[in-house]
């Protein structure tokens, strides 16, 4: 029996309308009743996730910013990882050949250089939103991550540019087909989950995890039981071909699987 369950949010727990379904909320509550530790492991900001936890009245650990922050049930900061100031400066000030918009994150929030209302659709559940700033005046000492949002082919070309400029000084990953992230070296959900399990006196073998994108790769590959969403990025399936694939987030597939796991643990599972 797993002792900790870790969940990605977008494309995993959240439905395509960016809400948590009632079946999902009910199943999460059942896990807590079984004394299974809940952990939300997401690229979203800690401020937003703390608001969501309050709204759904669930106790859960938080891995946010794709592993840049880990918080306890009480909101205590257990782990932090920031981009080196020189890396943040290079990414912010360089003229990249891209049409993608740039977004900067630190403990105070989400910052960008211009209004992009379409991006706020993903945050209707929480009301979290960006702050408009002059990117060139952004303090460099506390940047957790930098994201680029745009067309996937354009971002793929940008990834090559970033890698050539940064080398091994940053970790690049796609958190969605339309979002490329620049993270501290060694920073990912799997590394953050390792920190958390050590804090809790657990091993990664005691954990199950669910995800759909390349920012979930290390987490899914390191736990005792990793599950890939039916709507996952093809690259993730290719990287972890041995992991089982469950259903689509629109059908609350995590809830569907966990209900079977709780009620019929000895019977084979079918996502249909």
Curated annotation (Swiss-Prot):
Q: Which Pfam families match?
A: Hydrolase_3 (PF08282)
Cofactor(s) this protein requires? Mg(2+)
Name the residues annotated as catalytic in the UniProt entry: 8
* EC number of this enzyme: 3.6.1.-
Superkingdom? Bacteria
Role, per record:
Catalyzes the hydrolysis of 4-amino-2-methyl-5-hydroxymethylpyrimidine pyrophosphate (HMP-PP) to 4-amino-2-methyl-5-hydroxymethylpyrimidine phosphate (HMP-P).
List the protein's name.
HMP-PP phosphatase
Protein encoded by which gene = cof
